[in-house]
Structure formats: structure tokens, C-alpha cells
């Protein structure tokens, strides 16, 4: 997105989003906060900052992951287990005196520890109890939260989605907020329609380039982004009237598995997803409108009692 203008991607203070409804891809932030060892503290801070600007945050929790992500989840588990084993090995060596706790060892242990961060069921339930007490809405998705977040923004039930997941752009989410700083009350805003205009690219072509470059659904079938873009520019210069990927298949050997490309395309088709999950979306829509409720201070104190919070 290097070629995009400041109209499509720019840093903004949260004041710009005042009085808006923003859906949140919650799992991303639970992992970030868990990495800091302060899930409850940061969820509380996040809600406090949003309420300061009268932003209605709608936290969307993941449900059951799709079968298509099985390979990714297995790989992530192996990576976490490997990192944890290496961390424990280093820790044991230091504790037994076999190794010194020097700066390099400390850095390596800290790096490894971040690689096996896990969000527990307790973290999730604690977060929900804080949200209920603080008077902000949350939704429990039956599947992954991405589809639901994009749907709510595309259909006008929310203004934007807060997520660092690039998949939001593939779902065609019109407005995405990334890189949130709770310290500085700012974030980076992405206008998807303007981005496509700047790139002179359709949503379909954007998705194909992103899919070919690799998503969570085609880990073993990835191409270089720069190579894919280079081929797209060659396609543009040819002025061929066929779709980009059809041209690729006919004139190159770049796409190894056209059927797999088509399969992943369907996974990012929000209209297709809506057809198969109509009841879930209907249930969410019936719970509208999203709004802030009055804070229940007693329940909030109870929810944060084990986290060292002191209320004046």
C-alpha cells in the first residue's frame, strides 16, 4: 500500500472517531494485552479511552475456527510448544548455574516467552465481566470474528472495524482502524474504497493478489508479493480484457493450483458467508442498536478485585 495517498491511509487522533460505533476484532487485543501480562488492566483502559470520546466499542469474540484453518492452528501449536520448551531449557540452565543470566540470555528468554503467549478462558471471561460492568456491548461469534466485523461495517451497523488483521481488507470492510495507541489516543485509519482508487484496482484483483501472496488459508501455496505485483503490472500493460488470474493461468505457470485459489476466494466472499450463516447475522441484527449503558461501579470493582485496582 506504499502507493496510497494520505487520503486513504493516515494517522488520526481518536477524537475523529467520536460518537461512532466501532466493532473490535477482540482476540487480537487479548493476545497483545496477554503479552504484557495485563489483560484486565488494558481492557479496562481501552473501554475508558473509548468512552472518553463517546465511542461505542462492540467487542466481537471468536467462536469455533473453520476447518480450513486446521493446518495453521497445528503449525502455531507446534511453534508455541517449541518456543516454550526452549524457554524452559534456558530457565533451567540459569537456575542450575549452568548458564549465566546475562543480557543476551534475558533477551532470548523474553523473545521466546512472547512466542508461546496463550489467551486463557479465564482471560476471556474476565474481559466479558469488565465489559458488562462497564456498560459496553459484546458479541460471541459462532465462528471467527472477521466475517461478522466486516458484515457489521459493510451494512452500516458500525462505522469502522478496529483490527490489525489484514484479512479485513479482503472482506471488503470499508473502514479499518489499525495500530491503536491507548497511550497517545491515536490510531492509523484505512479507507478501503480510497485505497482501491489509489491503486487503480478492483476489490477482486486486490483479493487475488493478496491470496496469491499468502493468507491463513493457503500456507503451502504462497507466492512473492513483489512478483505478483510485477505480473499484475505486466497484465495491465497488455490491456488484456480477461480477469487477471485467468490471464495468469493462460499465459504463465505462476498459479500452481487454480482450484485452491478459487476455494480461498470463496472463503473471503462475505455474501456467500452471509447465505450460510444467515441465522447468526439475523440474531446479531435483532440485538441492535449498539449503545453504551450506564456503568455499574459495584460490579466493575468486583470484576477487577483480583487485579490490584483501587477506586477512589
How does the language model describe each region?
Residues 17-141:
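Noncatalytic, basic helical substrate-engagement surface that gates or grips nucleic-acid strands
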Residues 61-63, 137-148, 220-225:
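Acidic carboxylate-rich catalytic motifs and surrounding loops in phosphoryl-/glycosyl-chemistry enzymes
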Residues 75-78, 157-159, 178-181:
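Short, hinge-like loop/turn segments at secondary-structure boundaries
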Residues 168-171, 175-176, 182-188, 193-194:
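Conserved NTP-donor binding/palm subdomain of two-metal-ion nucleotidyltransferases/polymerases, i.e.
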Amino acid at each position: 500500500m506504499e502507493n496510497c495517498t494520505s487520503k486513504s491511509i493516515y494517522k488520526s487522533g481518536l477524537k475523529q472517531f467520536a460518537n461512532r460505533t466501532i466493532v473490535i476484532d477482540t482476540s487480537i487485543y487479548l493476545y497483545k494485552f496477554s503479552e504484557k501480562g495485563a489483560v484486565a488492566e488494558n481492557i479496562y483502559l481501552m473501554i475508558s479511552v473509548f468512552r472518553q470520546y463517546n465511542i461505542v466499542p462492540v467487542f466481537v469474540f471468536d467462536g469455533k475456527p473453520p476447518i480450513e484453518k486446521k493446518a495453521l492452528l497445528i503449525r502455531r501449536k507446534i511453534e508455541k510448544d517449541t518456543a516454550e520448551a526452549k524457554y524452559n531449557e534456558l530457565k533451567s540452565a540459569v537456575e542450575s548455574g549452568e548458564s549465566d543470566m546475562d543480557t543476551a540470555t534475558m533477551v532470548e528468554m523474553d523473545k521466546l516467552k512472547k512466542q508461546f503467549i496463550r489467551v486463557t478462558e479465564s482471560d476471556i471471561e474476565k474481559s466479558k465481566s469488565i465489559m458488562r460492568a462497564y456498560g459496553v456491548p459484546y458479541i460471541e461469534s459462532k465462528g471467527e470474528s472477521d466475517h461478522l466485523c466486516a458484515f457489521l461495517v459493510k451494512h452500516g451497523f458500525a462505522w469502522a472495524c478496529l483490527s490489525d488483521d489484514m484479512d479485513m481488507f479482503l472482506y471488503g470492510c470499508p473502514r479499518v482502524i489499525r495500530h491503536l495507541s491507548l497511550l497517545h489516543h491515536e490510531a492509523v485509519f484505512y479507507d478501503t474504497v480510497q485505497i482501491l482508487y489509489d491503486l487503480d484496482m478492483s476489490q477482486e484483483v486486490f483479493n487475488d493478489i493478496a491470496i496469491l501472496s499468502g493468507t491463513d488459508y493457503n500456507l503451502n501455496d504462497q507466492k512473492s508479493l513483489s512478483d505478483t505485483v510485477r505480473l499484475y503490472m505486466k497484465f495491465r500493460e497488455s490491456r488484456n480484457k480477461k480477469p487477471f488470474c485467468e490471464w495468469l493461468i493462460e499465459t504463465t505457470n505462476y498459479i500452481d493450483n487454480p482450484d485452491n485459489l478459487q476455494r480461498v476466494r470463496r472463503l473471503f466472499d462475505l455474501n456467500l458467508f452471509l447465505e450460510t450463516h444467515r441465522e447468526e447475522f439475523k440474531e446479531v441484527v435483532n440485538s441492535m442498536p449498539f449503545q453504551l449503558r450506564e456503568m455499574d461501579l459495584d460490579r466493575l470493582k468486583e470484576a477487577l478485585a483480583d487485579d490490584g485496582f483501587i477506586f477512589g
